[in-house]
Structure formats: C-alpha cells, structure tokens
C-alpha cells in the first residue's frame, strides 16, 4: 500500500531528511556560568515544513527577529524555537535548508531580501526571470539580491534528491533602472508562509 502522502510524481517526503539524503546536525553554542564557550544543544532543527505536494521539506535551522541580536539569557534560542518564522523577518535573519525530491522545481518567486544560497548536496539549475540560467554544484554559492528566480533539482538528471541551504537577510527598498519600486512575490510558496 502506498503511503497516504504519496504525490502524483511518485516521490514523497515523510520527514527530514528527505529519502536518500543524510541527517544533518545543528550545534548551538553559548557561554556557561564561568564564561566559557560550550555546546548548548545538538539537534536537527526546530521547525520542518512539507512543500510542493510533499516532494520537498524545509528545515528551519535558526532565525532571529532583530539585528543586532540579543543573546543574553539565551533569549534568541527561545524565540527561534517558539515561533516558526515567516519567509523572512524584517531586520532579522533566517537559515533555511530545503531537501528537494528528484526533478522538483520551485515556483518563480522574488523575496525582498539578500539570500546566500549554498548547494549542500546535488546539482541545481538556477533560472532567473530574464531566462538566464546557471548550473550549481555542491559548494557553489548564489547571492540573490531581490531577484526573481526559481530552482530546479537536476541531480542525477532529475532522478535523485538534492539539498540547498539559504541565509536570508532583510534589505532596503529596491528600485529598478526605471525608478520603480521592485515588489516581492512568492507565487505558490505563499501558502507555506501565510499567518506567520
């Protein structure tokens, strides 16, 4: 019998990590009562969200709601754990890792952020709204500056899962060459972030 969340493409994700990818470990450090640096937590992240008809899963590794960040009394750790963040925080930061099923394509979207995208496992095609494309492999980095784009997992010619990590930071209002304000849009990704 097929799992209840099996999607039309035959690949499904039931938990993080996605099938075929290794489990990641997040280590959070801090200070002990003597002022020494210590490991406070080692785990797999606080928030996981299924996406794209369960063909992908997002793992929120950390988020901050302000800059500079208040680290006193571990308040930042408490805030990150208590609340699953929106797509991005104004004046904050998010570290998001997404496991993509084979051949999965994100919708075209533009976040009003600066995003550092790092290919952790696999091969991806990064496509801009101009039609320009780049192939990115493990260790390659993209710097998205409020640009419209989508990601396609082409690992194993679209037969294997892949993983990308992003660090999202807020940016000031962006105007294009015509002097018009650039607007963000998430397309079908919006449903995964509404109400947060």
Curated annotation (Swiss-Prot):
Induction: Expression is up-regulated during sexual development. Expression is also up-regulated during confrontation with the arthropod fungivore Drosophila melanogaster. Residues 99-165 are annotated as: Cupin-like domain. GO terms for molecular function: oxidoreductase activity. SUPFAM superfamilies: RmlC-like cupins. Disulfide bonds: none annotated. Its EC number is 1.-.-.-. Keywords: Oxidoreductase. It comes from the Eukaryota. InterPro entries: OryJ/VirC-like, RmlC-like_jellyroll, RmlC_Cupin_sf. Highly reducing polyketide synthase; part of the gene cluster that mediates the biosynthesis of sordarial, a salicylic aldehyde structurally related to the phytotoxin pyriculol. The most interesting aspect of this pathway is formation of an aromatic product from the highly reducing polyketide synthase srdA. SrdA synthesizes a reduced polyketide chain from one molecule of acetyl-CoA and five molecules of malonyl-CoA. The polyketide chain is then reductively released as an aldehyde. Belongs to the virC family. This is Cupin-domain-containing oxidoreductase srdD.
């Amino acid at each position: 019998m097929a799992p209840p969340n099996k999607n039309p493409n035959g690949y499904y994700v039931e938990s993080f990590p996605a099938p075929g990818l290794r489990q990641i470990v997040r280590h959070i450090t801090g200070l002990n009562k003597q002022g020494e640096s210590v490991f406070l937590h080692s785990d797999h992240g606080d928030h996981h969200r299924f996406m794209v008809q369960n063909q992908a899963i997002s793992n929120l590794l950390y988020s901050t709601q302000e800059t500079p960040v208040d680290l006193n009394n571990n308040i930042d750790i408490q805030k990150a754990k208590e609340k699953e963040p929106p797509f991005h925080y104004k004046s904050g930061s998010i570290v998001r890792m997404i496991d993509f099923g084979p051949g999965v394509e994100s919708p075209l979207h533009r976040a009003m952020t600066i995003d550092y995208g790092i290919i952790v496992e696999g091969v991806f095609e990064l496509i801009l709204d101009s039609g320009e494309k780049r192939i990115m492999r493990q260790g390659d980095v993209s710097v998205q500056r409020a640009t419209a784009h989508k990601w396609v997992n082409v690992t194993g010619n679209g037969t294997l899962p892949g993983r990308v990590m992003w660090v999202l930071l807020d940016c000031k209002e962006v105007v294009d060459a015509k002097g018009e304000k650039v607007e963000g849009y998430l397309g079908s990704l919006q449903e995964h972030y509404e109400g947060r």
